[in-house]
């Protein structure tokens, strides 16, 4: 069984790598836009190998974006009232949409759990030295019919030459409140290889991702080399932006 799995890994490893790279780029665009007020920028960091440049915007309404009353910084950890900022978002949205989740980075969760006022909110002033965990905050939120917090930990790898650089697309300073259900769609078009396939290339499909496999070197008697590529003419589109709210925790 182990030999079989290793053989499958050798045969499918390159294909899985390039397919995952396409999924990673789609996640990067979606999570980047979702956590940056509906905007995503193609630049040297997000697209170092060139091609598409510029930015896209899904037009989050200005009234859906709020800044914290006090910056969520280490200097303010004993005075900042995280829930006051959260309550302001809930108040602003209550007549427009039913929010289900608050998406945020692990660092924002850790900060909330360590603040003095959050400990007092969860445990009371007499037990404010007791540690607060995410499940404690979410128990409080669920009890009061508020959206629960969900950490975003996605890391993608961006190809830059021969190096794959880890990149976190989520803006760790923002908390994004979303309604239940799907937030958008992935729009697709036919790729070039679907419209005009090349000779000597083997193609396969994974959903709307097309992989290409070809070899060089055999005819010339030189070293045989195989190449694998994945291609997808796709763009994630956030369709529910009018019901999505952003809290900027660092003013």
Model segments located where?
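Low-complexity, compositionally biased segments
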Residues: 17, 46, 50, 62, ...
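Sequence/fold signature of self-assembling virion shell proteins
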Residues: 68-71, 75, 119-251
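Long, contiguous amphipathic alpha-helices that act as assembly "spine/axial" helices in icosahedral shell
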Residues: 1-61, 81-108, 224-232
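Short, surface-exposed beta-strand/turn modules with glycine/proline-rich turns
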Residues: 60-69
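Proteins with a high burden of low-complexity, intrinsically disordered sequence enriched in S/T/G/P/A and R
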Residues: 1-2, 64, 78-82, 139-146
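Charge-rich, low-complexity amphipathic helices
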Residues: 33, 40-48, 115, 125, ...
